[in-house]
Amino acid sequence: MKKQLALALALAAASGAAFADGHSYTYLEAGFAQLDQELPGTEGFEVDDIEAGGFFVAGSAAVSPSFHVFGAYRKGDDDVGVSSPVLGEIGSSNVDMSQAVLGVGYHHGLNARTDLVAELSWLATEIDVKGDNEGAQDGDDVRAGVGVRHLIADNVEVWIKGNYTDGDVYDGAFSASVGLQYKLTPTWGLVGEAEGGGDTAMFAVGVRASF
C-alpha cells in the first residue's frame, strides 16, 4: 500500500509539473472567430455594424529564450442591413472581412508563473462588399502591444495586453486584449480571446496545441 501511495503521489507530482512548466511560445491553434467593425451612417440611411463570423488559424514559434515570432489569419462574413427612418429596412449586402497578422515578440519571466510580453506586429485588413462593383477596401497597420501572461493554476493561463495601432485602417487606436487557456493535457488546450477598442472588436474560441 505504501508503495502504491508513493507511486500515485509521484505520478500526480509529475503531471502537475508538466502542466505548470512555464509558458509555451511555440504553438498552433484554430477555431471560430468574429470580427466586428462599427460603420458610420450616411445621410438619410442607417447601416448595421459588421459582425463577421468565421474562422481563425494562428501560431507562434520561439526563436530564442527571449524572442518569438507569431502570426494569425482571421476571416468571416456577415449580411449587413441598410435601413431608412422613413422607409424602414431597405435591404442588405454580404460583406467579407479578413485580417492577417505577422509579428515578433519579446518575453521575460517576472516570476515562475508570470511573463512580461512586448510585441510589434503588422496587420493587413480587407473588407469586401459583394456586388458593389467597387472592389475590396484594404489597408496595412502597425501595432505595438505590451502585457502579461500568468498561470492562475497549473493548467489555467490568462493574459492581458494593451495595444496601440496606427495606419490605414486604425487611426491611432488604443485597444485591450484578454485571453484564457485551459489545458486539457500538457499539449492540448482550449483557448478564448477577446479584443476591443475604438470602433473594432474581435472574439475567438478554439483549440491550441503547444509544443
Where are these regions (language model features)?
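Cleavable N-terminal export/targeting peptides
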Residues: M1-Y25
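Outer-membrane beta-barrel proteins
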Residues: G16-F19, F56, V63-P65, G105-L110, ...
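Short glycine/proline- and aromatic-enriched beta-strand/turn motifs that initiate or cap beta-hairpins
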Residues: G16-V69, Y73-D79
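Repeated loop/turn-to-beta-strand initiation elements of outer-membrane beta-barrel proteins
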Residues: L28, P65-G71, N111-L116, I152-I160, ...
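Transmembrane beta-strands of outer-membrane beta-barrel pores
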Residues: F32-E38, P65, Y73-D79, S98, ...
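Outer-membrane beta-barrel translocator domains and adjoining extracellular loop/strand segments
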Residues: E38-V47, D79-S93, I127-Q137, Y170-S175, ...
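Solvent-exposed loop/turn segments connecting transmembrane beta-strands
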Residues: D48-E51, N94-S98, L110-A112, D138-D140, ...
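Residues on the lipid-exposed face of transmembrane beta-strands in outer-membrane beta-barrel proteins
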Residues: V57-A61, L102-Y106, L120, V146-H150, ...
